[in-house]
């Protein structure tokens, strides 16, 4: 007999339309409305990347691809998909409540972030657990999946494909910048989070398995809180690497993200490219995983290892 289970796919969320921008960022800032200047800056950034971030549609596509792959991988389980977002509807709590209404008593949760931190994955899981406890729903959480061979294979392939576009005699003058979303240092230290070590491990695995000679780790998209965040910032890192080594080619792999969205399309493709243009170096940024079978397969393999 086929067992029915929920698959709760959790993500940060993104505005669907321009009128969502203010409530979305108010939620991010714990109820504090952004100023008109901050709001205009955000609207300008979205306009710069061609309109609202494609994240919403990509998140839906990733969730659909994942539930489809899981239902092929498990002959005796039928997974029903639920999407829960942190900062915009459908919220995580809405998704868990809907599970209860549908008679789901057991579910797997997956956050669309490959590395674990209490700030992201941990806080999402906590919100899901608190809501699930009201209904007696048992949740099994995927904590991370960056170590899965298919995840590393995806990025290794992309690095090698990018290197193939660069003349071989320039490979020694090429550096790979591996990055993730920065987080407040105090939070990482207080919770003894493995987040920085997981990014370092990801970079090491990519270096071991790809043809890249030089690699550096950076952080990006930090918030404006007035407190120290993880560094170095990728823009500062780019300048420092150029000053020390005169690299001609910079390849950026924001491996902490899983699709093209504002942080990649603006913070990398605009801000990092501006620095590269300024120092006279070439900017490269391979395609993000999105719904690539290796990426979806990595999450399926992680689920198989815990369930």
From Swiss-Prot:
One example GO MF annotation: metal ion binding
Pathway listed: Porphyrin-containing compound metabolism; protoheme biosynthesis
CDD domains recorded: Ferrochelatase_C, Ferrochelatase_N
Catalysed reactions, semicolon-separated: Fe-coproporphyrin III + 2 H(+) = coproporphyrin III + Fe(2+)
A Pfam family that the UniProt record links to this protein: Ferrochelatase
Location(s), subcellular: Cytoplasm
Keywords noted in UniProt: Cytoplasm, Heme biosynthesis, Iron, Lyase, Metal-binding, Porphyrin biosynthesis
Domain of life, per lineage: Bacteria
EC number: 4.99.1.9
GO cellular component terms attached to this protein's record: cytoplasm
Binding-site residues, Fe-coproporphyrin III: 12, 29, 45-46, 53, 124
First-tier enzyme category under EC: lyase
Positions of Fe(2+) binding: 181, 263
GO biological process: heme biosynthetic process
Record PANTHER family: FERROCHELATASE (PTHR11108), FERROCHELATASE, MITOCHONDRIAL (PTHR11108:SF1)
Function field: Involved in coproporphyrin-dependent heme b biosynthesis. Catalyzes the insertion of ferrous iron into coproporphyrin III to form Fe-coproporphyrin III.
Similarity-based family: Belongs to the ferrochelatase family.
Protein name (Swiss-Prot/TrEMBL): Coproporphyrin III ferrochelatase
Species annotation: Staphylococcus aureus (strain MRSA252)
Gene (UniProt): cpfC
